[in-house]
């Protein structure tokens, strides 16, 4: 198990912003999901959601997203998304996230997905190869 946190860097651009000159609210879940996909890629040999769905016939649709906004996100600094699993259930996984710009906490979040057999869209048990990687990395929020 590694003690180094997984941090995904997001380049926030002018196009991500609304007239208030901060990141458009709808972009923040987008950034979070991008970081979660990057977490999968980092821990599963470059395989993210696309490969899991198409090559492995395993989907992970979201059933819950919760975010608390702490400070505005702007293009001024990179958004650093610390991403980590907080729970692995029988058929679901929950990720936690802390997103910072310039060492200022911008948002926190909790994101739960269920494992599905993609071609029939039915829930399934988390595969053993997923459990083997995820279980040692689970941490509290």
Locations of regions flagged by a protein language model:
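Hydrophobic beta-strand-centered segment that forms part of the acyl-chain substrate-binding groove
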Residues: 40-80, 85-92, 108, 114
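Hot-dog-fold acyl-thioester-processing enzymes
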Residues: 2-62, 118-141
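HotDog/MaoC-like acyl-thioester-processing domains
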Residues: 3, 7, 74-78, 86-141
């Amino acid at each position: 198990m590694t003690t180094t946190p997984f941090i995904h860097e997001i380049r926030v651009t002018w196009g991500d912003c609304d007239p208030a000159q901060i990141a458009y609210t709808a972009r923040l879940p987008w950034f979070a999901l991008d970081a979660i996909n990057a977490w999968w890629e980092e821990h599963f040999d470059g395989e993210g959601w696309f490969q899991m769905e198409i090559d492995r016939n395993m989907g992970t649709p979201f059933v819950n997203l919760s975010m608390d906004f702490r400070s505005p996100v702007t293009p001024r600094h990179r958004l650093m998304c610390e991403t980590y699993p907080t729970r692995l259930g029988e058929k679901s996984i929950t990720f936690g996230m802390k997103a910072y710009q310039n060492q200022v906490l911008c948002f926190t979040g909790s994101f739960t997905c269920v494992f599905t057999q993609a071609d029939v869209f039915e829930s399934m048990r988390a595969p053993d190869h997923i459990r083997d990687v995820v279980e040692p990395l689970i941490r509290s929020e």
